[in-house]
């Protein structure tokens, strides 16, 4: 690692007024959005990525990373104050955060959440800085066969993120893989499933309009449906916040939870598709198991909040490791960041550490800056963020819809993209309605073309002999890990479903 270049990259990024401003705005927007139940960091990044096209790479990445980190912390605000996690990853925070609020310790819970989230983010950024170059060095030996098996490994993670039904997750992924085949064949340029008159689909379905439709427009449609049915209940909080940071006594008590949570979050975040919602519960369970008083967890103690929030934001650095070093997104937000890099003419992966090393180091600096901005935003606004949970959804949904459609249009200045955005909004709404997960679609949409291109290249090199791939140790490692991920995920999900069925039967008895 070139430490002089790393330090100069930090100096360049942290002294750039545009980067500072964009990252701060991103952190502020992320916290505000994350505090509203149902509004995730993924949605925030998807909404704003079209508006980053006119910026240079690092200011735009700073904006998106600010939203990412801010949104991860923002979800804890509503979880603590009104027992409604703003993001899925904040679900474990309410286990101790909300009981603290009911004890009259809302300010303390929010300050612990903010401090732990910042520390977890810093741990994740540091691990990313020193680990991702090592992974990239290993990946320099990858050829088309290894890249194909890497994509297969990434696709195998779909089973892990499919939720209650593996079958529905696979159906979502299969649907997305079919979408990837629309447009010009990447190897011979022959149009597939379109005519030459359908110019809007020559390059396939544009990533950003599809993404905005699936994650933002679908939520607007679902929200309007809830309002019409009278199922959308406005939630308010009247808590007065006094402390902006935990006192030294509390910090001494929670630092082991922060350290372990940050490391757990980072390493789970580095597994493509795992995500913060898994990391927070693993961290919470580990913290509870290691405690001398596990019976206190769930009654409202700072240790529980610290363990979950440090893991929550630690995932941000972890998820960037496979993105930068392998070109495989670690979660849905880094999948969007992958699209942002590609649209700026930079392809993440091992070659990025050879041809774009200063850019890589500036991304490291931008992530650290994003966590610092999140802390500043939290300190300045923690007394007022409680008001965010009281925003009427009737006012919020039209604003989100307008921003979504403008974002879809702004990419190519093409009304066709707006139609694609709306169409995928309806598809996303229907899939959510019938409990088909959306994350597998996103993962398959990113990895599908990578899988196809490298498979065709490999088969051409090997003259049709696919089984020659068994001679590559790296490819076989990815294949083995993919099989283990699938088997473990199916086994684990079947256990969860059986336990849920047994609990339901017990309640009905």
Predicted regions and their residues:
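Flexible loop linkers connecting adjacent transmembrane helices
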Residues: 47, 81-109, 134, 138, ...
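Re-entrant/interfacial helical elements at transmembrane boundaries that shape
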Residues: 41-51, 64, 79-99, 130, ...
């Amino acid at each position: 690692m070139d430490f002089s270049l790393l330090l100069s990259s930090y100096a360049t990024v942290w002294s750039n007024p545009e980067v500072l401003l964009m990252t701060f705005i991103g952190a502020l927007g992320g916290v505000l959005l994350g505090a509203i139940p149902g509004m995730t960091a993924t949605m925030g990044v998807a909404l704003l990525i079209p508006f980053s096209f006119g910026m240079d790479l690092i200011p735009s990445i700073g904006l998106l990373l600010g939203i990412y980190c801010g949104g991860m912390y923002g979800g804890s605000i509503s979880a603590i104050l009104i027992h409604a996690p703003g993001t899925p990853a904040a679900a474990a925070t309410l286990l101790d955060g909300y009981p603290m609020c009911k004890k009259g310790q809302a300010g303390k819970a929010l300050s612990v959440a903010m401090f732990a989230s910042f520390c977890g983010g810093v741990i994740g950024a540091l691990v990313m800085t020193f680990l991702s170059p090592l992974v990239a060095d290993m990946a320099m030996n990858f050829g088309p066969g290894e890249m194909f098996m890497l994509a297969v490994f990434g696709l195998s993670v779909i089973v892990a993120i499919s939720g209650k039904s593996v079958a529905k997750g696979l159906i979502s992924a299969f649907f997305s893989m079919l979408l990837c085949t629309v447009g010009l064949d990447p190897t011979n340029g022959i149009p597939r499933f379109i005519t030459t008159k359908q110019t809007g689909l020559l390059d396939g379905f544009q990533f950003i309009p599809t993404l905005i439709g699936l994650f933002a427009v679908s939520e607007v449609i679902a929200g309007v449906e809830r309002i019409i049915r009278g199922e959308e209940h406005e939630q308010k909080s009247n808590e007065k916040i006094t402390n902006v940071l935990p006192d030294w006594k509390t910090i001494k008590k929670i630092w082991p939870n922060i350290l372990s949570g940050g490391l757990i979050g980072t390493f789970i975040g580095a597994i493509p598709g795992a995500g913060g919602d898994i990391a927070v519960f693993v961290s919470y369970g580990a913290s509870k198991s290691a405690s001398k008083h596990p019976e206190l967890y769930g009654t409202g103690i700072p240790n529980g909040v610290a363990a979950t929030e440090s893991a929550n934001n630690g995932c941000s650095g972890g998820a960037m490791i496979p993105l930068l070093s392998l070109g495989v997104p670690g979660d849905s937000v880094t999948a969007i960041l992958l699209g942002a890099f590609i649209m700026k003419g930079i392809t993440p992966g091992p070659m990025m550490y050879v041809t774009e090393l200063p850019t890589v180091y500036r991304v490291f600096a931008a992530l650290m800056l994003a966590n610092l901005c999140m802390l500043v935003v939290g300190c300045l606004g923690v007394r007022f963020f409680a008001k965010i949970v009281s925003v009427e959804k009737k006012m919020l949904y039209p604003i989100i819809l307008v921003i979504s459609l403008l974002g879809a249009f702004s990419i190519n200045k093409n009304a066709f993209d707006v139609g694609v955005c709306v169409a995928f909004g309806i598809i996303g709404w229907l899939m959510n309605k019938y409990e088909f997960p959306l994350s597998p679609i996103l993962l398959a949409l990113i990895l599908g073309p990578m899988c196809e291109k490298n498979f065709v290249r490999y088969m051409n090199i090997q003259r049709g002999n696919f089984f020659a791939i068994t001679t590559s140790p790296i490819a076989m490692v990815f294949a083995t890990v993919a099989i283990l991920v699938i088997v473990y995920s199916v086994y684990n999900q079947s256990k969860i479903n059986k336990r849920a069925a047994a609990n339901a039967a017990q309640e009905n008895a």
